């Protein structure tokens, strides 16, 4: 997993970064639009993650993307329309699944 990382935030167009950080991901359509823009901005980061770590849920993929954008748990909950406890549960599952969790970010 060491070769996964994508671009750093400071190399991404500020307008695109703003758009990603202020997205709302409530529907599958919202997620697809967000994922497309995110992958374009971060060198197919999410696609690479999905290929290298099969079996990740959509919620886990969303968490990874939002965490990479340095979004807080509270804001992740608002963006995805779930409670903060749901976000914490996703993080907990990821920590169990991925021994190299911190290297993703």
Where are the language model's segments positioned?
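N-terminal regulatory/sensing modules of transcriptional regulators
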Residues: 1-26
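Cytosolic nucleotide-binding catalytic cores of signal-transduction proteins
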Residues: 19-20, 24-105
């Amino acid at each position: 997993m060491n070769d996964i990382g994508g671009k750093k935030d400071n190399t991404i167009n500020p307008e695109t970064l703003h758009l990603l950080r202020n997205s709302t991901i409530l529907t599958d359509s919202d997620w697809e639009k967000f994922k497309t823009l995110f992958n374009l901005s971060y060198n197919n980061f999410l696609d690479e993650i999905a290929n290298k770590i099969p079996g990740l849920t959509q919620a886990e993929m969303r968490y990874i993307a939002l965490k990479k954008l340095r979004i807080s748990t509270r804001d992740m909950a608002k963006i995805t329309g779930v409670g903060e406890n749901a976000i914490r549960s996703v993080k907990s599952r990821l920590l169990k699944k991925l021994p190299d969790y911190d290297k993703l970010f």
